[in-house]
């Protein structure tokens, strides 16, 4: 729709269609159009993917409009351009009596058609489910280009903004890798492993490896009270982990929470060692890992798992389950279960 991916992962590019160029142009025009309404915003990066769009927008000063209002304005402009390209007449002033005053139509539609005079007004006051039914019943051509709503992330600081911009620019490369390597770039919203459910992203085949070794470290050494990663015991453990990895057919399993766990997790990512990382953040339909873990997934060396309802698991030693203390122990208990798991993970299609 917006174009197609060209080249390879080493030299990714998006070859835009006329519609993709129109969407990109609408994005670049946001600051100028919003200035007409007294809103000061800036756009920093954008990319049209074949079937969706990414962009970074900055609000320069407080304004009466919400970000949703601005996004809706851009989406409406794109929809109108799409209609023009396809020779579809605008629907904004079409009277509802043309196709709504029909006794065979649902009662809710006839009631709303009596309230809102134009098609545009009517559409704005329908729920997503009602709109979908309306398009089917009435057979309208004037469907919106974009889905309802949008997925957003709030930028925290300048470093976060630069990471956002880098992510936007990296999208074509990521998409090429996902298409080229579907087996090791899977996103599954429901995977059952042993007695627990997870969201997953990456190489699910790592669960089949016979030798799964847990990396678990407390923050302090139980005898000396030293930071555990600074002790001789940790050095010996790490040497054993590395020996197991280099011996072959071994995958590390860890949440990477304590400093000692984090150091080993990062070494696996940097050196391409097989790793199952159990994280506390959930994996939804739009979730993707940051670049380092994404590339590890592309190399087939990483599986990211996110347990369902982590904060509803058992409290540990009377400490609430949504505390860092209980999360640390519960995630490591899950790592123990995964290491002993030798069955087949059950994947539920969603």
Residue ranges and their predicted role:
Residues 1-188:
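Short catalytic/metal-binding and nucleic-acid-binding patches
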Residues 186-350:
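Glycine-biased, small-residue-rich flexible motifs in mid-sequence functional cores and linkers
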């Amino acid at each position: 729709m917006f174009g197609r991916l060209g080249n390879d992962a080493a030299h990714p590019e998006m070859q835009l269609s006329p519609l993709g160029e129109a969407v990109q142009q609408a994005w670049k025009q946001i600051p100028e159009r919003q200035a007409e309404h007294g809103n000061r915003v800036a756009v920093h990066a954008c990319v049209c993917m074949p079937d969706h769009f990414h962009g970074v927008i900055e609000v320069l000063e407080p304004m009466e409009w919400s970000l949703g209002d601005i996004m809706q304005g851009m989406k409406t402009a794109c929809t109108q351009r799409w209609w023009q390209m396809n020779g579809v007449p605008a629907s904004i002033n079409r009277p509802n009596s043309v196709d709504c005053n029909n006794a065979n139509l649902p009662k809710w539609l006839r009631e709303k058609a009596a309230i809102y005079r134009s098609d545009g007004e009517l559409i704005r006051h329908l729920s997503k489910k009602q709109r979908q039914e309306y398009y089917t019943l009435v057979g309208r051509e004037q469907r919106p280009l974009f889905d309802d709503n949008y997925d957003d992330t709030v930028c925290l600081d300048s470093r976060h903004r630069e990471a956002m911009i880098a992510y936007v620019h990296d999208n074509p490369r990521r998409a090429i890798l996902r298409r080229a390597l579907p087996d090791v770039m899977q996103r599954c919203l429901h995977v059952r492993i042993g007695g627990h459910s997870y969201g997953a992203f990456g190489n699910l085949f790592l669960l089949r490896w016979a030798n799964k070794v847990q990396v678990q470290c407390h923050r302090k050494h139980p005898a000396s009270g030293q930071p555990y990663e600074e002790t001789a015991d940790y050095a010996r453990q790490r040497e054993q982990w590395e020996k197991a990895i280099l011996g072959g057919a071994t995958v590390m399993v860890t949440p990477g929470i304590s400093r000692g766990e984090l150091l080993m997790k990062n070494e696996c990512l940097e050196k391409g060692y097989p790793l199952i990382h159990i994280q506390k953040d959930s994996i939804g339909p739009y979730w993707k890992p940051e670049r380092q873990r994404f590339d590890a997934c592309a190399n087939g060396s990483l599986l990211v798992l996110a347990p369902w309802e982590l904060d509803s698991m058992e409290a540990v030693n009377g400490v609430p389950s949504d505390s860092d203390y209980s999360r640390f122990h519960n995630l490591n208990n899950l790592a123990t279960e995964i290491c002993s798991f030798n069955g087949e993970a059950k994947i539920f299609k969603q």
